[in-house]
């Protein structure tokens, strides 16, 4: 009986681990560079490195045969491939997609992209000059930011005196903890 329980929980753990796999084609092992900080000046000139980067989409421009996206780089989870929303940005990069991608579908969204590092491109961020690393995308996944409001559970403790009709008067409201996640 003990062996069956152990086997059940082991299978359950492996089953739940499979639920957080990265999107197909964006597995960490397929790319030689997996973060913005790993990009060196030599990588930008050789055009031979594959990268997996992610972040928040800042700007989208539709060109004649391709779509150009400016991305505010964020660290990407090595397990799920999702950008970490809470962390500081490493910088910015530009992604080129072959064909047309609807710009309205990309507003206020997050992206994980895999492709070939294709050099640099000069640009501006407001008044400052900036050199963007450029990625020619093969695979990508768009993420939507969702919000959860979590209320503290200690407010409903069984040991509290609930008063008349099993509830007590509260002249204040408990503030929820706001959590963000990508789906």
Q: What is each PLM-predicted segment?
A:
Residues 19-183:
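OB-fold and OB-like single-stranded nucleic-acid-recognition modules
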Residues 1-19:
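Sec-dependent bacterial lipoprotein signal peptides
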């Amino acid at each position: 009986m003990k062996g069956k329980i152990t086997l059940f929980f082991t299978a359950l753990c492996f089953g739940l681990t499979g639920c957080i796999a990265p999107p197909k084609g964006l597995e960490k092992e397929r790319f030689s560079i997996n973060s913005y900080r790993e990009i060196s000046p030599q990588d930008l000139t050789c055009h031979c490195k594959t990268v997996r980067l992610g972040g928040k989409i800042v700007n989208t421009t539709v060109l004649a045969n391709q779509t150009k996206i400016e991305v505010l780089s964020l660290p990407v989870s090595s397990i799920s491939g999702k950008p970490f929303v809470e962390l500081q940005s490493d910088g910015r990069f530009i992604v080129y997609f072959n064909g047309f991608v609807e710009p309205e579908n990309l507003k206020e969204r997050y992206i994980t992209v895999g492709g070939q590092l294709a050099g640099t491109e000069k640009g501006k961020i407001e008044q400052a000059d900036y050199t963007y690393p450029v990625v020619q995308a093969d695979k990508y996944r768009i993420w939507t930011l969702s919000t959860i409001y979590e209320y503290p559970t200690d407010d409903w403790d069984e040991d509290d005196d609930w008063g008349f009709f099993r509830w007590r008067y509260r002249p204040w409201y408990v503030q929820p903890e706001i959590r963000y996640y990508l789906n």
